[in-house]
């Protein structure tokens, strides 16, 4: 009875072990071209595809006589054969390893082999796992090319075989490994020391360098003394480099690194090497809207401002003058060692057309050119050398106002003018059109003396002043305040615009270009005939003196 029960129990165990899906032990009997024969102690040997016995490199990792685990797919497939699977057994083993690693917080070996939304895929010995982007490293990593295809250690942080879900972390491994090393490194870090590190990640603003458990930032501005557009110009991921610790915040575990600080600062005593005014050759490294940068030596660049590129066009775009990598001649204009700035000039290497004009055109010389533009304040005339001269409104005409005179000109007209003043330093040329003729005021003054009795035409008047036109471009003023004997109100009643009157020159105001006058009235003792001969009064104008005489008499009678 007991023997039969023991026999039945053993048989029941065999049944359990030989159910489909069970993992059983087998021995490799032979290896053929396409199949491997395995004896698992069943009714017959089973043929398993040889591909299931090859490793990642495509090589067989078994030999005849090896004992292996296989999965039982079917005891009888309908043709009297038992179906076994080495692949499913491997997968079963892989899950067991992952479960054990997860329970004991051990690391597993895997290979990053792809990128998916939110992270990467990792091959863990037949099992596909997910590696979140945030768990690749202790710092954000945008590019994992340097990690892909390599065997790396990971920690299993989530495992669900039913859902075939495995989540791993490389960051946890790094933090665990670096903990002791990191503490030791943090104790030894000091500002100013030189240390080795490996570039682990690049960003637009710099590179993160692994110093051995602690990452430091090598900012793009501390990579080289010269201008660097992108960190990849200086370093690459995986490079082992020497760096200098510039700043170290132990509390926040932040390390600022410098690469350029390992070399000599080219800005030291730069003013001695490049005094103002020296001419140099350099390479154009960059163009901007406001100018171009020129490298005059390794690590030293200067700015040619757009205003220093061309003598005649102040708003020209740099791309119209130079291109990146052009070798150009420049003049050092200014050096600010403290702010590390050099101002360079491109136009100064060429002839200054303003200076040239100043040397060849003295005051009074006549010039000609086309009108380039007309503004509210004058006329710009194009001159030789691509420069302009300005005729101010006040220098257009002797006889009429500038606002009226400018209406007689238009853009494109060819006109002549006289050079009045040249300021080469301020790049200004003053021209005059009216100066092409004699000044009618000066002519009039030279032909008339103080005290002379003359005729004039009333142009305008008010309670204080009478404006008298004496000739083209020449006017005089009569101020009632200068005639204390008269009543201005009575005089004003007799005055009419365009009346011809007799006046006397009291003085000349050359500064304001005005001739001061007084009324001249004939009395009974005056010899009208002699007066007419002196001032050439025509017969039809003879009455003007009598009219004014009567006006003065009336004014005096009211007193």
Swiss-Prot record:
- Which superkingdom is the protein from? Bacteria
Keyword Repeat appears in the UniProt entry: yes
Q: Which residues form the S1 motif domain?
A: 21-87, 105-171, 192-260, 277-347, 364-434, 451-520
| Any one GO BP annotation for this protein | translation
SUPFAM superfamilies reported for this sequence: Nucleic acid-binding proteins (SSF50249)
- Keywords assigned: Repeat, Ribonucleoprotein, Ribosomal protein, RNA-binding
**What are the GO MF terms of this UniProt record?**
mRNA binding; structural constituent of ribosome
Cellular compartments per GO CC: cytosolic small ribosomal subunit
Q: Which Gene3D superfamilies match?
A: Nucleic acid-binding proteins
Cross-referenced InterPro entries, in alphabetical order?
A: NA-bd_OB-fold, Ribos_protein_bS1-like, Ribosomal_bS1, Ribosomal_protein_S1-like, S1_domain
Pfam families in UniProt: S1
Q: Does this entry carry the keyword Transcription regulation?
A: no
What is the documented function of this protein?
A: Binds mRNA; thus facilitating recognition of the initiation point. It is needed to translate mRNA with a short Shine-Dalgarno (SD) purine-rich sequence.
Similarity-based family: Belongs to the bacterial ribosomal protein bS1 family.
- Record's protein name: Small ribosomal subunit protein bS1
Look up and give the organism this protein is from. Buchnera aphidicola subsp. Schizaphis graminum (strain Sg)
């Amino acid at each position: 009875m007991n023997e039969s029960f023991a026999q039945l129990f053993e048989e029941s165990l065999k049944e359990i072990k030989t159910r489909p899906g069970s993992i059983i032990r087998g021995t490799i009997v032979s290896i053929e071209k396409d199949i491997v024969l395995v004896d698992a102690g069943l009714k017959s040997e089973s043929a398993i595809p040889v591909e299931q016995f090859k490793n990642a490199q495509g090589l067989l990792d078994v030999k005849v006589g090896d004992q292996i685990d296989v999965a039982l797919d079917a005891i009888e497939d309908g043709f009297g054969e038992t179906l076994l699977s080495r692949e499913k057994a491997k997968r079963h083993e892989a899950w067991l390893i992952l479960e054990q690693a997860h329970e004991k917080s051990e690391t597993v070996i895997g290979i990053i082999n792809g990128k998916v939304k939110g992270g990467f895929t990792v091959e863990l010995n037949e099992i596909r796992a997910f590696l979140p982007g945030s768990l690749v490293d202790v710092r954000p990593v945008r590019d994992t090319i340097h990690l892909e295809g390599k065997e790396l250690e990971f920690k299993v942080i989530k495992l669900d075989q039913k859902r075939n879900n495995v989540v791993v972390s490389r960051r946890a491994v790094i933090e665990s490994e670096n903990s002791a090393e990191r503490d030791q490194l943090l104790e030894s870090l000091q500002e100013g020391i030189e240390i080795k590190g490996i570039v682990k990640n690049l960003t637009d603003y710099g590179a993160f360098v692994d110093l051995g458990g602690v990452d430091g930032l090598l900012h793009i501005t501390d990579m080289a003394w010269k201008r660097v557009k992108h960190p990849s110009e200086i370093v690459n991921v995986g490079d082992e480099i020497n760096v200098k610790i510039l700043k170290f915040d132990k509390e926040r575990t932040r390390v600022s690194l410098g690469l350029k600080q390992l070399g000599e600062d080219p800005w030291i005593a730069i003013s001695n090497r490049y005094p103002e005014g020296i001419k140099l050759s350099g390479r154009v490294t960059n163009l901007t809207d406001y100018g171009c940068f020129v490298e005059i030596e390794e690590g030293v660049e200067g700015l040619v401002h757009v205003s220093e590129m061309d003598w005649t066009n102040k708003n020209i775009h740099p791309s119209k003058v130079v291109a990146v990598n052009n070798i150009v001649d420049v003049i050092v204009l200014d050096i600010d060692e403290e702010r590390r700035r050099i101002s360079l000039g491109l136009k100064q290497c060429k002839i200054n057309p303003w200076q040239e004009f100043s040397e060849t055109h003295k005051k009074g010389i006549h010039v000609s050119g086309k009108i380039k533009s007309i503004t509210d304040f004058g006329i710009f005339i194009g001159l030789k050398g691509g420069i302009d001269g300005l005729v101010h409104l006040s220098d257009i005409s002797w006889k009429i106002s500038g606002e009226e005179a400018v209406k007689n000109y238009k853009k494109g007209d060819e006109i002549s003018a006289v050079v009045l003043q040249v300021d080469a330093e301020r790049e200004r040329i003053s021209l005059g059109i009216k100066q092409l003729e004699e000044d009618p005021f000066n002519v009039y003054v030279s032909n008339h003396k103080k005290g002379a009795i003359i005729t004039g035409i009333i142009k305008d008047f008010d309670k204080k002043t009478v404006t008298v036109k004496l000739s083209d471009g020449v006017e005089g003023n009569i101020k009632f305040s200068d005639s204390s004997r008269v009543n201005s109100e009575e005089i004003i009643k007799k005055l009419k615009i365009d009346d011809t009157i007799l006046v006397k020159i009291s003085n000349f105001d050359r500064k304001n270009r005005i001739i001061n006058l007084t009324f001249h009235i004939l009395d009974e003792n005056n010899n009208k005939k002699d007066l007419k001969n002196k001032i050439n009064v025509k017969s039809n104008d003879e009455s003007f003196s009598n009219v004014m005489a009567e006006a003065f008499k009336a004014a005096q009678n009211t007193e």
